Amino acid sequence: MIRLVLVDDQPSVRQGLRMRLTVEPDMTVVGEASNGREAMILVQQLAPDIVLMDVQMAEMDGIEATAEMRASTPQSAVVMLSISDDVSTRARAHAAGAAAFVHKSGAIELLLATIRQAAQHR
């Protein structure tokens, strides 16, 4: 079972992801956070397999949180989610240690495949 933490400052995005991911037989959502700081605490407590992390958030953005998370909790892989698809954002996410980067408007099948692949390679 792939254990996930969802991190996004929009409750509707977290709710939509949770509803879609929990119907997958090999996935379970174990926690949710609305910013990078909350995510850091949850990841240290729950040690999920995958963290689905939004890029743009208040308090601590997803890229900064990913860099700190990779240093403190390397067993959890981070899959970045963003509405922005520019090369610079992707490069910063990968430099911070993200396992993958998925555009929010992409097909759910791509996100599911990315989660499964990141879980296998973490």
Q: Where in this protein do the model-derived segments appear?
A:
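C-terminal output helix
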Residues: 88, 106-119
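Active-site residues of response regulator receiver
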Residues: 8, 54, 82
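Acidic, metal-coordinating helix/loop segments flanking the phosphotransfer/catalytic sites
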Residues: 32-50
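Acidic catalytic/metal-coordinating carboxylates
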Residues: 35-38, 60-64
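The feature encodes the CheY-like receiver
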Residues: 58, 86
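Short amphipathic alpha-helix used as the core "switch/output" element in two-component signaling
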Residues: 41, 63-74
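A short, hydrophobic beta-strand element within the central beta-sheet of small alpha/beta folds
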Residues: 75-85
